[in-house]
Every structure is written in C-alpha cells, then in structure tokens.
C-alpha cells in the first residue's frame, strides 16, 4: 500500500503532545494589536487543545502524527 500524504497546511498549524492530543495556536494575535489589552494578548499567546469534535478531522490530515 502506498504511503499516505500529509496535508502540509495542517502540519504547519498543529503539533502532537506526548499523550497524543493535538495543540493549536489561538487566533487574533497576528496584527491590529494596538487596541487589544495586554491581558488579552497574553491569553492569546498560550496554546490551546483542538476541540474533541475536530480531532478526527485533524488526525486524518496528519496520518503520521
């Protein structure tokens, strides 16, 4: 059977934790940051787990993760 291809766009956006969960970056921290408070920007800096409803889709895009 041939190798499965990884979706490169997904590979750049998601990482796997040691326990097999997927981690993502939060949105709204790229530009237009002047009016956002420092507390909010700090909160957006932290990583977030992928929602359980999306895990199956992400794992199909990353067959070797």
Swiss-Prot record:
For whether the record's keyword set contains Cytoplasm, the answer is no
Which Gene Ontology biological process is one annotated for this entry?
A: translation
Q: Which GO terms describe its molecular function?
A: structural constituent of ribosome
Q: Which UniProt keywords apply?
A: Ribonucleoprotein, Ribosomal protein
State a GO cellular component annotated for this protein. Answer: cytosolic large ribosomal subunit
Asked if the record carries the keyword Transmembrane, the reply is no
The record's section on SUPFAM superfamilies has:
L35p-like
Which Pfam families is this protein grouped with? Ribosomal_L35p
**Annotated PROSITE patterns:** RIBOSOMAL_L35
By sequence similarity, the record places it as follows: Belongs to the bacterial ribosomal protein bL35 family.
Q: Which PANTHER family match?
A: 54S RIBOSOMAL PROTEIN BL35M, LARGE RIBOSOMAL SUBUNIT PROTEIN BL35M
Q: What is this protein called?
A: Large ribosomal subunit protein bL35
What is the species listed in this Swiss-Prot or TrEMBL entry? Thermosynechococcus vestitus (strain NIES-2133 / IAM M-273 / BP-1)
Which gene name belongs to this protein? rpmI
């Amino acid at each position: 059977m041939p190798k499965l291809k990884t979706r490169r766009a997904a590979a750049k956006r998601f990482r796997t934790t040691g326990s097999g969960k997927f981690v993502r970056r939060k949105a709204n921290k790229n530009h237009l940051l002047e009016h956002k408070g420092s507390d909010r920007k700090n909160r957006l800096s932290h990583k977030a787990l992928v929602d359980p409803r999306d895990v199956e889709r992400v794992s199909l895009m990353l067959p070797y993760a």
